[in-house]
């Protein structure tokens, strides 16, 4: 706690525990005592959309099998109640109307249920037009079967067309770096669109998670900007973008960098973009731990020229970092104070905090 004599105990966000958000954007938080049963099933559509494909296929296959079995039982019960099971269907009594021809066992009833749902015509087994119960049951099965097929088809289309799938083509650098831009330290990361189709209206936001006051998580917004673009949105995302956060005294990261062993924190980065073809918004997430922030490094160049003068993106250099050249020392001014910054056990460097930011 800031400005307090109480010792902060923070056992949750430590490096021996898993990160809250994985590098590919999935949450690792587990909900104890969350709602279950009917309250959980109210969002059945959302549950299906979040399922993995193998479980979704299993659920849909089981739905069809259960549908066929339920109506097989109903057709069998109808045949038994009508007295059709023990009859010779080729020579029935003159005063007896067979509801469904040749249903003499449960296997035959299941076969008829399957045939009713999946075909447009009947073979040797067919319902009699003189049996109202058979016609009513046939109509009910067809209606429920069409509803089930429509629901499953819609779920497949919705899952395939989700914007989430487009987000998988957005790639963040595995590491972030702290480098000097115009003599001022900046936290930098890169993001790339690995598909040739562009994204528009790109927005980046970040949240710094720290544990304070005996296990309570504290969230702080961290602002990033893109080169010299004054707008919060990048209108066109086709080549790798580099985002910067200026480490000035008001930055939530400035105080964290003053420790030889910085307290554990997690910086979660969110990128939202709009698909040009559909207008749908997709989001990609990643996170950076203190061990994934490289001090006095910069990213390798990604752009090159081809033989015809066209731009080429060297994705093999995407995660490569190189040590930056040390900037000459700046004379102290009355408005600057010295502090030592240590990250991940790297070399100890002397910086000065001024009104314009950290300078070496």
UniProtKB/Swiss-Prot annotation:
Family annotation (Pfam families): IRK, IRK_C
Cross-referenced SUPFAM superfamilies: E set domains, Voltage-gated potassium channels
Keyword Ion transport carried by entry: yes
Membrane-topology descriptor: Multi-pass membrane protein
Keyword annotations of the record: Cell membrane, Ion channel, Ion transport, Membrane, Phosphoprotein, Potassium, Potassium transport, Transmembrane, Transmembrane helix, Transport, Voltage-gated channel
The organism's place on the tree of life at top rank: Eukaryota
Major site of localization recorded for this protein: membrane
Localization terms from the record: Membrane; Cell membrane
UniProt-recorded name of the protein: Inward rectifier potassium channel 13
Provenance organism: Bos taurus (Bovine)
Lineage, opening ranks: Eukaryota, Metazoa, Chordata, Craniata, Vertebrata
Underlying gene: KCNJ13
């Amino acid at each position: 706690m800031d400005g307090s004599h109480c010792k902060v105990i923070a056992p949750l966000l430590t490096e021996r525990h898993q990160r809250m958000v994985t590098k590919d954007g999935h949450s690792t938080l587990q909900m104890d005592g969350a709602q279950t049963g009917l309250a959980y099933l109210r969002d059945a559509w959302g549950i299906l959309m979040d399922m993995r494909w193998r479980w979704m296929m299993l659920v849909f296959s089981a739905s069809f099998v259960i549908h066929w079995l339920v109506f097989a039982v109903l057709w069998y019960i109808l045949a038994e109640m009508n007295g059709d099971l023990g009859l010779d269907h080729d020579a029935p009594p003159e005063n007896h109307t067979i509801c469904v021809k040749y249903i003499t066992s449960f296997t035959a009833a299941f076969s008829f249920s399957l045939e009713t749902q999946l075909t447009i015509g009947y073979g040797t087994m067919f319902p009699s037009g003189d049996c109202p119960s058979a016609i009513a049951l046939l109509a009910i099965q067809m209606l429920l079967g069409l509803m089930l097929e429509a629901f499953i088809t819609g779920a497949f289309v919705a899952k395939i067309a989700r914007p989430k799938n487009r987000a998988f083509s957005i790639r963040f650098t595995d590491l972030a770096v702290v480098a000097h831009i115009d003599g001022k330290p900046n936290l930098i990361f890169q993001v790339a669109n690995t598909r040739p189709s562009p994204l528009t209206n790109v927005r980046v936001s970040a949240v710094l998670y720290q544990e304070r006051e005996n296990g309570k998580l504290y969230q702080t917004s961290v602002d990033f900007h893109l080169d010299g673009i004054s707008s919060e949105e990048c209108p066109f995302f086709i080549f790798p973008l580099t985002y910067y956060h200026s480490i000035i005294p008001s930055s939530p990261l400035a105080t964290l960098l003053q420790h030889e062993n910085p307290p554990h924190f997690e910086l979660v980065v969110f990128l939202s973009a709009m698909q040009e073809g559909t207008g749908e918004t997709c989001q990609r997430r990643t996170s950076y731990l203190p061990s994934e922030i490289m001090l006095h490094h910069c990213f390798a160049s990604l752009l090159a020229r081809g033989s015809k003068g066209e731009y080429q993106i060297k994705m093999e250099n995407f995660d490569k970092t190189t040590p930056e050249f040390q900037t000459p020392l700046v004379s102290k001014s009355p408005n600057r104070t010295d502090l030592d910054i240590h990250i991940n056990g790297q070399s100890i460097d002397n910086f000065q905090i001024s009104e314009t930011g950290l300078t070496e």
